[in-house]
């Protein structure tokens, strides 16, 4: 699933090319792509016609277009969703097609059909307007209003693994499996350590590292392990070449030379250095 940097790459592309444009045509090619819009495909199509796109937004992994009727079009990318501008060659996985008033084609392509579009109202949470489905999502480390000290306080009250908390979008959003492993490696913290047992200073360093690694990834177009994670022009990012932890099982740690390990965690894989990031000791009974 795309994480914050990959979603932000898409948002920036949309902001540049669709802001100020009016939607003049919409066609839903697969009903599953609008299953979150409870009123159905016909309602979504009718409500989008002749509506102007006033801007774009993102919180964590959530992406949306703001509209001039005070609604928002939430774009769920899911595992493989793509927002593409211009003509597309392969229409096998085209789920929704829209046309803008300058003739630009805006396509939602989704091979695995976990994503989709949803029209929703905006609500105000902590002084910020967000789509209603995003109201429960915490701010992410790249949000200008992100309160690191507040999140550290929340983490100090959590008696479960720190990696589990990094992945909890109600605690801090946007950090997925890849960037959690990268931030943990940068700070030499094992993801199995209990959040409440970590000093405030270390938790602050971890959140800073998450922001830094995602900023680094954003500068390289995000992380793309296959052709599914692309920008609005269909181009893949290349931060996967710079990963220090994720996907490096059996390779030497770039810092100390120890062999990187992989372990199962929450139906995912965790990658870490056993020397730089030793597992927490299990108390003897």
From Swiss-Prot:
Binding sites annotated in the UniProt record for DNA: 93, 112, 158
Molecular function terms from GO: 8-oxo-7,8-dihydroguanine DNA N-glycosylase activity; class I DNA-(apurinic or apyrimidinic site) endonuclease activity; damaged DNA binding; zinc ion binding
Co-factor binding details: Binds 1 zinc ion per subunit.
EC number, UniProt record: 3.2.2.23, 4.2.99.18
Known catalytic reactions: Hydrolysis of DNA containing ring-opened 7-methylguanine residues, releasing 2,6-diamino-4-hydroxy-5-(N-methyl)formamidopyrimidine; 2'-deoxyribonucleotide-(2'-deoxyribose 5'-phosphate)-2'-deoxyribonucleotide-DNA = a 3'-end 2'-deoxyribonucleotide-(2,3-dehydro-2,3-deoxyribose 5'-phosphate)-DNA + a 5'-end 5'-phospho-2'-deoxyribonucleoside-DNA + H(+)
UniProt xrefs under Pfam families: Fapy_DNA_glyco, H2TH, zf-FPG_IleRS
Cofactor: Zn(2+)
InterPro entries xref list: DNA_glyclase/AP_lyase_DNA-bd (IPR015886), DNA_glyclase_Znf_dom_DNA_BS (IPR015887), Formamido-pyr_DNA_Glyclase (IPR020629), FPG_cat (IPR012319), MutM-like_N-ter (IPR035937), Ribosomal_uS13-like_H2TH (IPR010979), Znf_DNA_glyclase/AP_lyase (IPR000214), Znf_FPG/IleRS (IPR010663)
Keywords in alphabetical order: DNA damage, DNA repair, DNA-binding, Glycosidase, Hydrolase, Lyase, Metal-binding, Multifunctional enzyme, Zinc, Zinc-finger
Enzyme active site: 2-3, 61, 268
Inactivation phenotype: Loss of excision of 8-oxoG from dsDNA. No significant growth in the presence of 3 mM H(2)O(2). 4-fold increase in mutation frequency upon plating on rifampicin (mutator phenotype); an increase in A to G and C to G mutations is seen.
PROSITE patterns found in the cross-reference section: FPG_CAT, ZF_FPG_1, ZF_FPG_2
Gene Ontology process terms (BP): base-excision repair
Zinc finger (FPG-type) stretch: 244-278
Keyword Iron listed: no
NCBIfam families recorded: fpg, PRK01103.1
Family: Belongs to the FPG family.
Assembly: Monomer.
Functional description taken from the UniProt entry: Involved in base excision repair of DNA damaged by oxidation or by mutagenic agents. Acts as a DNA glycosylase that recognizes and removes damaged bases. Acts on oxidized purines, such as 7,8-dihydro-8-oxoguanine (8-oxoG) when paired with C, G or T. Has AP (apurinic/apyrimidinic) lyase activity and introduces nicks in the DNA strand. Cleaves the DNA backbone by beta-delta elimination to generate a single-strand break at the site of the removed base with both 3'- and 5'-phosphates.
Protein's UniProt name: Formamidopyrimidine-DNA glycosylase
